[in-house]
Amino acid sequence: MKLKKTVVTTVVVAAMTVLAGCQSVPEARQQSVIEQLSSVSMLRQDNIAGAYEVAVAPGVDSVFVAAVPAFEPNSGGVVQRLDPRSLQVVQSIQLPRRSFALGFNPTSSTLYVGNTLDGSLTVIDATNGAVRGMIQLGERVVDGKGQVSAPHTRKVVVDPLRNQIFVTSPDSEGLVWIVDGATNKVRHTVETNGPWPAGAAFDRANNRLYVGQGGLNEVVVINPENGEIVNTLSTGDTTSADPKESKHFFVNMAIDEKNQRLFAADANTGSVYVFDLGNGKVVQIVPVGEGLLDIAYSEQRNEILATNRGVSRGSPAGTGSLTVIDGTNYSVNRRVDLPVHPNSVALSANGQTAYVTVKVPHGNDHPAWRKDAQDSIVRIDLQGG
């Protein structure tokens, strides 16, 4: 399968042909093309080098993608602003540090970029792409060779109501930083007492942060007001405190605030674990597939969306998909086949459209490898069946 500039419907191919020469196309015709693009069930653009997380920002009519085009020492990052209809890049925001994760505050129109390898957040004005500043979360250390290291960041979750930002740090003895969005200062640093805190989901009504990790207690519940762990949730499957014995690793999570359910993507088993937050028990386990990575919940559709790369030690080639799970009976409503390897998923404000980043394989021994291929962004109309 060729990954370069591949689009999945004939109407999109025609539309993109028009867009390629958009400078000479009358405005009315351009608008007609956008309407066509908005009506298709799936659209894919292979136009981002080093894509990672995606975030939807309806208030500024944009989709943002964090990207790391190069991994050389001292290389920077890029946040690409995309048109949510055509998925064309409309602005490239250059950053001094590599950008992996994204969190968006719709109230202040602020975009927070997780600089994973530098232990920091870059703060961006989402209205114009201006960099407002940087928040150093973990201490940066320079060794004798001049190499800089810092505790890594992972997930960035924003509470717009209280203007607070949560950032996980997935080390063997991991941390969670709670940042005051008004001052850009770290308010609390929380030790989770477990390995690799990675995924996170926030309950806005109850002001509770849920953090997924490995170990004996795969979920910790944090009160952001005082930075204290107020509860833990466990599958009960892990019986040893040795991280190597962890049966699960909840790499990403999503929450159903209305019905008080937590959805955890387990990278170890490739299944979604559903917790009832009322009693803290696992009520359902939904197999998705190898390389399970990201997860989102559409309250409007009562559906859980999960990406999986199809990659494991047993199958390094991998096949990708987005799995859509019924939130009532937990059956699989549909699987959307995607190129390798689906990465991050985000939903539109109305919960009817999914945006997924897809990474190309790096090794030339992979059957889908193509020289100079770029990563993709895919828009999927969930109403399209």
Can you name each region flagged by the protein language model?
Residues 1-23:
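Gram-negative bacterial Sec-dependent N-terminal signal peptides
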